[in-house]
From Swiss-Prot:
Gene of this entry: rpmB
GO cellular component terms listed in the entry, alphabetical order: cytosolic large ribosomal subunit
HAMAP family, alphabetized: Ribosomal_bL28 (MF_00373)
Record-level GO BP terms: translation
Name of this chain's protein: Large ribosomal subunit protein bL28
Xref: Pfam families: Ribosomal_L28
Length: 97
């Protein structure tokens, strides 16, 4: 299981802790990942995802998992999230027709 958000692609960053004397020590900055269950209204199912707390706020701000995935860019999404996005788009196209 990688330390990356499945929806936004946010992952581990590397940098320095800098002391008052300007001594630098390497460190890793880990994303705040949460295991959450999100419900797709279009598909009528719940999906368990490992996403960052920031992504969870974005999902709620955009109005749910379906709206977030439709508006998001494919290159940021994980392979599983891309599959979910395609299923949602297909189901919405069927409902519109």
């Amino acid at each position: 299981m990688s330390r990356a958000c499945e929806l936004t692609g946010k992952s581990v960053q590397y940098g320095n802790n800098v002391s008052h004397a300007n001594n630098r020590t390497r460190c890793r900055f880990l994303p705040n990942l949460c295991n959450v269950t999100l419900i797709s209204e279009t598909l009528g199912q719940s999906y368990r995802l490992r996403i960052s707390a920031n992504a969870l706020r974005s999902v709620e701000h955009r109005g749910g998992l379906d709206a977030f995935l439709v508006k998001s860019d494919d290159k940021e999404l994980s392979q599983r999230a891309r599959l979910l996005k395609r299923q949602i788009a297909k189901k919405q196209a069927e409902a519109a027709a």
